[in-house]
Amino acid sequence: MEPSVGIVKTRHIDFNGDLRLESGRLLAAPITLAYETYGQLNADRSNGILVTHAWTGDAHAAGRHTPEDRKPGWWDDMIGPGKVLDTNRYFVICSNVIGSCGGSTGPTSINPRTGRPYNLSFPVIMVRDMVRAQKRLIDHLDLPSLVTVIGGSMGAMQALEWGVLFPDTVRSIIPIAGTGRTSPMAIALNALARQAIFNDPMWKKGNYRPEHPPADGLALGRAIGHISFLSNASMHLKFGRRFSARDGMFDFFGQFEVERYLEYNGRAFIDRFDTNAFLYLAKALDLYDVAWNYDSREQALDRIQCPSLWFTFSSDWLYPPQEAEDIVNILQKLGKPAEYHPIQSDYGHDSFLVEPEKFTHHITEFLNRLTV
């Protein structure tokens, strides 16, 4: 059995100050952040690493909450004794983003000004707002700086924003399978997912009861999103053109294996994620542009003062390699130390979760060059 961080607990911290959002609105206090930590702080509190999660992730990145848990945290392959993010060396933190439903303040939370759940009265948030909330946690933990901020997909956006927003705090950033701004195609896919939810009569304009969510709409919305995480090659390998039951081939409702998989994946998602949180995070993804409130991407990226390590995946069509390459090229033209590794993989956008062994040695080498 591989080394593990063992049994872990999700913690919660409430912050008393309101949070001014990029929209200009205030997110009212108390603002809760759910987080987990792995490993121990060193004497001068200089060994902290922040892990940032993707769209439907949470703070539970490694270990298990109980011995009976079927699966460990979502990045357990990466975090633990002797692993890439070595908990014998680093103090690793992962927090749930605001706007989500994993314990941090989001649309399911109680609005302190009304005493009722926010639902759609929750303000629209941006990735930059998520990062500002995370900075409060890092300050609460009394970490003067971070060795790195590392994450994939939406986590890569957060890592990049850390470099732009808090250049004096981060000593490096590692964006994986990310982009500098969300493309029209990615926005279009999210629009379809939204419409699937809006067309479910149980959605009730976001005022559904938790025990009666818009299950059909959320399942379909998730399935639409999930397709973009895969690739043509991985779907051929996993499903081919196989039917789930041969005698259903000429049954009008007979299913290919890929159909059954999408249906199962969507239905399983209902039990672990809130619909409004799904919508709010999709909106945050759509709005993402590192140049927001700057005159250009160059002006935003010139704020980064630390080395960066970038990974893309050849079959990722959600955030194609060229999108991250554009950011790396700008950084290098600005004289910033930006290291880039395009990874050959057939697993699409999810390659960073499926085949970490293809890029982790680069992370180890990169971290070894940094001072802890």
UniProtKB/Swiss-Prot annotation:
Domain of life: Bacteria
GO cellular component: cytoplasm
Main localization (coarse): cytoplasm
Pfam family, any one: Abhydrolase_1
Enzyme class: transferase
Active site, per annotation: S153, D316, H349
Pathway where it operates: Amino-acid biosynthesis; L-methionine biosynthesis via de novo pathway; O-acetyl-L-homoserine from L-homoserine: step 1/1
EC number: 2.3.1.31
InterPro entries: AB_hydrolase_1, AB_hydrolase_fold, HAT_MetX-like
Function in brief: Transfers an acetyl group from acetyl-CoA to L-homoserine, forming acetyl-L-homoserine.
Alphabetical list of NCBIfam families matching this protein: homoserO_Ac_trn, PRK00175.1
Name of the protein described by the UniProt record: Homoserine O-acetyltransferase
Species of the source: Syntrophotalea carbinolica (strain DSM 2380 / NBRC 103641 / GraBd1) (Pelobacter carbinolicus)
